[in-house]
UniProtKB/Swiss-Prot annotation:
<dbReference type="InterPro" id="IPR023584">
    <property type="entry name" value="Ribosome_recyc_fac_dom"/>
</dbReference>
<dbReference type="Pfam" id="PF01765">
    <property type="entry name" value="RRF"/>
</dbReference>
<protein>
    <recommendedName>
        <fullName>Ribosome-recycling factor</fullName>
    </recommendedName>
</protein>
<dbReference type="InterPro" id="IPR036191">
    <property type="entry name" value="RRF_sf"/>
</dbReference>
<dbReference type="InterPro" id="IPR002661">
    <property type="entry name" value="Ribosome_recyc_fac"/>
</dbReference>
<comment type="function">
    <text>Responsible for the release of ribosomes from messenger RNA at the termination of protein biosynthesis. May increase the efficiency of translation by recycling ribosomes from one round of translation to another.</text>
</comment>
<keyword id="KW-0648">Protein biosynthesis</keyword>
<dbReference type="GO" id="GO:0005829">
    <property type="term" value="C:cytosol"/>
</dbReference>
<dbReference type="GO" id="GO:0043023">
    <property type="term" value="F:ribosomal large subunit binding"/>
</dbReference>
<comment type="similarity">
    <text>Belongs to the RRF family.</text>
</comment>
<dbReference type="GO" id="GO:0002184">
    <property type="term" value="P:cytoplasmic translational termination"/>
</dbReference>
<keyword id="KW-0963">Cytoplasm</keyword>
């Protein structure tokens, strides 16, 4: 493995960690409605679990209400049940062939709990990025040991990887700060 391959691998894997964080943060409910909140809710469809977005049209009615329009009318009850049983704390209302999902206002205590969850997700992402840095540095040390690169090249590559790590950690901090602000906004 060359220095460029090690750097590229670290960069790709760090980007995946960042993407995972973004997905995890999008699942955390804020006071506002957004269609992405139902993305990970699974509904039983002909014996197999599928995301709600594949069996229904999910739209925003207003800042606090989501409308779910099933493609097949009989699916309405199953979708309503799946949303109610999800860990999101939502209480969907059936309107015949469609479902309204009002977003309850978050209490101050719930907001604080959610910010702790957000910080935890951010810390997990930072740990993942730092572990990737460590793996990349170990790979570089192995190249030096096998006399494939000089110690100067190793130091330069380690500096590159450190800059990459710093950039990703800064991006993680930015995402966490944005999400916390979103949660704490009443």
């Amino acid at each position: 493995m060359s220095v460029a391959e090690i750097r590229k691998s670290a960069e790709t894997r760090m980007a995946k960690s960042l993407d995972t964080l973004k997905v995890n943060l999008s699942k955390i409910r804020t006071g506002r409605a957004h269609t992405g909140i139902l993305d990970h809710v699974q509904v039983e469809y002909y014996g197999s679990p599928v995301p709600v977005s594949q069996v229904a049209n999910v739209n925003l009615v207003d800042a606090r209400t989501i409308s779910v329009q099933p493609y097949e009318k009989p699916m309405a009850a199953a979708i309503e049940k799946a949303i109610r049983e999800s860990d999101l704390g939502l209480n969907p209302m059936s309107l015949g062939d469609s479902i309204r999902v009002p977003m309850p206002a978050l209490t101050e205590e719930r907001r604080r709990d959610l910010t702790k969850v957000v910080k935890g997700e951010g810390e997990d992402a930072k740990i993942a990025v730092r572990n990737l840095r460590r793996e990349a540095n170990e790979s570089l040390k192995k190249l030096v040991k096998d006399k494939e690169i000089s110690e100067d090249d190793e130091r330069r590559a380690q500096d590159d990887i450190q800059k990459l790590t710093d950039r990703n950690v800064t991006e993680i901090d930015k995402l966490i700060t944005q999400k916390e602000a979103e949660i704490m906004t009443v």
